[in-house]
Regions:
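N-terminal module-boundary/linker segments of secreted carbohydrate-active enzymes
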Residues: 34-71
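N-terminal Sec signal peptide cleavage junction
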Residues: 28-30
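Bacterial N-terminal signal peptides
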Residues: 16-26
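Catalytic cores and adjacent binding grooves of peptidoglycan-active enzymes
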Residues: 169-178, 182-286
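Acidic/His-rich structured neighborhood in mature extracellular/periplasmic domains
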Residues: 103-118, 163-168, 172-176, 186-190
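Active-site acidic/histidine clusters and adjacent loop/turn architecture
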Residues: 86-144
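N-terminal secretory signal peptides that target proteins for export/translocation
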Residues: 1-12
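Extended, low-complexity, intrinsically disordered C-terminal regulatory tails
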Residues: 137-164
Length: 286
């Protein structure tokens, strides 16, 4: 008897599962979506023309974004070149230089650097000829590479320490009118920088129509001490010094470099010449 009851219960198990499965299917078959009929939809007519508007909006005008404070001192991707970049490269840490002259051994000591003297003065303010600053910033922007000034202003002590030859004692580094430099990443391509300098005078509006500034000539005399004939216009004199030329204490690197001298002062409309009073008596000593 007990065995028959167990057998009947086992036979009923599949039937129970069938009933549960059926209930599950029927409960999921109903849809929750409501059916919309055309009569239940409403609309609203628009009573205006396409050009009509309730709010008058002024036409948009392009306004150039103001520069951030830190951007004002940028020249391309690098800090803007100022007169401070031209400070004398001398330092009292440099060793004494011994130079054998015809009759004696001469000792040359370097200056104390910017901590001991100022740049040249104009109207009692430190001064470097603006064309040098403008040119170097222009090069830095156009190339997006750093301009390295190897020699800007030289005080008399540093000047003779760098090069004691008599002819070097009358250069325009002494009066803030000359600069030696190269461009990082273009050290061995100075011709590209020369082309940029020539183009500068074509692009700047203030030189437009001024033939003496826009046209460069080549210096034909043999006293330039370089193998490449220099370029010049009314304002500047440009020299290419190859890596086998023009080495001194400030230019001990192995690259060719460029030298720009100022010939003409745009502001005063006068030629720029070396003078002893400017070189030796026109800067502060501390």
């Amino acid at each position: 008897m007990f065995q028959v009851i167990i057998a009947n219960k086992l036979n009923l198990l599949p039937l129970k599962f069938l009933v549960i499965f059926f209930i599950f299917l029927t409960s999921c078959s109903s849809s929750s979506k409501s059916t919309a009929t055309p009569s239940s939809l409403t609309g609203e007519y628009i009573y205006r023309h396409h050009e009509d508007s309730q709010i008058q909006v002024e036409p948009m005008i392009f306004v150039k974004r103001k520069t951030y404070p830190w951007e004002e001192n940028q020249s391309g991707a690098y800090p803007k070149i100022t007169k401070d970049f031209f400070r004398c490269k001398g330092t009292s840490l440099n060793p004494v230089r011994l130079v054998q002259k015809e009759k004696e051994l001469v000792r040359y000591y370097d200056c104390g650097g910017p901590q001991k003297h100022s740049l040249p003065l104009k109207n009692q303010k430190e001064f470097i000829y603006p064309i040098l600053i403008d040119l170097l910033n222009y090069i830095q922007v156009k190339t997006n590479k750093r301009v390295v000034i190897t020699c800007g202003h030289c005080c008399p002590d540093h000047n003779v320490y760098v090069d004691s030859s008599p002819s070097y004692q009358f250069n325009k580094h002494l009066i803030g009118a000359e600069v030696d430099f190269y461009v990082q990443g273009l050290e061995y391509q100075p011709e590209k920088i020369i082309e940029l300098i020539l183009n500068y005078y074509q692009e700047m509006p203030k030189y437009k129509g001024l033939k003496d500034f826009q046209e460069f000539k080549r210096y034909e005399k043999g006293d330039s001490k370089v193998s490449t004939k220099p370029w010049y216009n009314q304002e500047i004199f440009l020299k290419l010094i190859k890596k086998s030329e023009g080495r001194d204490f400030d230019n001990r690197h192995s690259y060719p470099y460029l030298c720009v001298q100022v010939r003409y002062d745009w502001e005063t409309k006068q030629k720029v010449h070396y003078s002893w009073s400017q070189a030796f008596g026109n800067f502060h000593r501390w």
